[in-house]
């Protein structure tokens, strides 16, 4: 789309917001904002511990008392109690720890899943992040300034470029069955004029800006998790999802 000056822009009721945006900024300029601000987990951290909380996945149910009884939320408006479910809590926690951060020092940053069901309308069930193998996988996430997350959620070209960067950085591409068609399209990507120069186009070619190197503190956090998982497998209550946890560990070849 040809770019228009601010004085020329006429916004009608039927105008698509993304088209209007791309009339002011090029796709390259949009992606440049992400290029210069994103925070990536180091490949060494990913290899050390690919998935941090395999007991959790999007829409999973929360339990208290060491997985022995349901954790409920009570509505102030209706007084009704409902079973509390996972939104993005443990994905956020995994990414925060893998970047050596603390939640309270992460104001206005958002966890963005790289591989998932592409649905700008937010109407489809996201089977990828409902999979225990991929929800808290640190190679499936990037930390972005919160306003920029909307670009990744609503602009397929931006999400594709993130996926190309991630698979070349980590040497891994999500192989969930529901991603077979999107992954095939990714192989045909040819919009390199908008792809950031600082991002890798091939495996191990380069690292994007914003990679947080594996530090002793990050390593220490990663090395705590296998012992916790091992203890939960042995001792957690009846609602602990043992089969799904073991399947995730087997997929990633994690030995406890």
What spans do the regions from the language model cover?
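Polybasic, low-complexity binding patches
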Residues: 151-191, 195-196
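Acidic, low-complexity intrinsically disordered regions
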Residues: 36, 48, 63, 105, ...
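Generic recognition of cysteine residues
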Residues: 111-112, 137, 165, 174, ...
């Amino acid at each position: 789309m040809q770019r228009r000056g601010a004085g020329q822009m006429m916004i009608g009721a039927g105008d698509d917001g993304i088209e209007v945006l791309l009339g002011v900024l090029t796709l390259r300029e949009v992606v440049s904002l992400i290029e210069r601000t994103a925070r990536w987990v180091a490949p060494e951290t990913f290899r050390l511990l690919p998935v941090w909380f395999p007991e959790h996945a999007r829409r999973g149910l929360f339990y208290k008392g060491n997985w022995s009884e349901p954790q409920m939320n009570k509505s102030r408006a209706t007084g009704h109690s409902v079973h509390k479910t996972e939104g993005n809590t443990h994905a956020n926690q995994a990414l925060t720890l893998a970047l050596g951060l603390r939640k309270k020092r992460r104001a206005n940053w958002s966890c963005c899943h790289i591989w998932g069901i592409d649905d700008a309308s937010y109407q489809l069930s996201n089977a990828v992040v409902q999979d225990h193998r991929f929800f808290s996988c640190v190679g499936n996430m990037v930390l972005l300034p919160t306003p920029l997350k909307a670009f990744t959620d609503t602009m397929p070209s931006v999400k594709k470029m993130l996926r190309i960067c991630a698979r070349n950085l980590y040497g891994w591409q999500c192989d969930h069955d529901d991603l077979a068609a999107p992954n095939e399209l990714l192989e045909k990507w040819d919009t390199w004029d908008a792809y950031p120069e600082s991002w890798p186009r091939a495996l191990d070619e380069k690292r994007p800006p914003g990679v947080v190197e594996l530090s002793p503190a990050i390593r220490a956090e990663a090395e705590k998790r296998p012992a916790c998982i091992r203890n939960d497998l042995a001792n957690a209550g009846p609602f602990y999802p043992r089969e799904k946890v073991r399947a995730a560990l087997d997929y990633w070849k994690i030995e406890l």
